[in-house]
């Protein structure tokens, strides 16, 4: 990525490569680098990205935004809401399928 000066317009995060360092990606919406945004600010940024006109977005695979209205009884990440890693486990329950081998099962072969 080219270096950005303080007065330069930041590139859209949707047009950057997936392997770009987070510290160099600016939201372009709130004017705060992702690495420095509190969790609540990231949510606002996500909602604002959804509202961008189609010509501002890069064409690609569909992206879905989920908001869950429950609190995890055993949250290791947050106390009041559920962290993203936990929603993958508790809501989608991807670990309940028997056909999926764990990394440790693969190592024991």
UniProtKB/Swiss-Prot annotation:
Family the UniProt entry places it in: Belongs to the type-B carboxylesterase/lipase family.
Q: Which domain of life is it from?
A: Eukaryota
The residues the entry assigns to the signal sequence are none
**Alphabetized UniProt keyword annotations:** Hydrolase, Serine esterase
Any one GO molecular function term? juvenile-hormone esterase activity
Describe the function of this protein.
Answer: JH esterase plays a crucial role in the decrease of JH activity in lepidopteran insects, by hydrolyzing the methyl ester of JH. It is also involved in the transport of JH.
* Record field: catalytic activity: juvenile hormone I + H2O = juvenile hormone I carboxylate + methanol + H(+); juvenile hormone III + H2O = juvenile hormone III carboxylate + methanol + H(+)
- Enzyme Commission identifier(s): 3.1.1.59
Q: In which tissues has expression of this protein been reported? A: Fat body, the site of their biosynthesis, and the hemolymph where it is secreted.
Q: What is this protein called?
A: Juvenile hormone esterase, isoform A
What is its EC class?
A: hydrolase
């Amino acid at each position: 990525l080219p270096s950005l000066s303080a007065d330069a317009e930041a590139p859209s995060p949707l047009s950057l490569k997936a392997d770009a360092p987070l510290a160099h990606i600016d939201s372009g919406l709130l004017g705060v680098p992702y690495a420095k945004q509190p969790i609540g600010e990231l949510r606002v940024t996500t909602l604002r990205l959804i509202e961008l006109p189609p010509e501002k977005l890069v064409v690609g695979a569909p992206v879905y935004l989920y908001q869950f209205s429950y609190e995890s009884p055993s949250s290791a990440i947050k106390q009041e809401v559920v962290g993203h890693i936990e929603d993958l486990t508790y809501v989608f329950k991807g670990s309940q399928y028997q056909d999926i081998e764990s990394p440790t099962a693969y190592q024991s072969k």
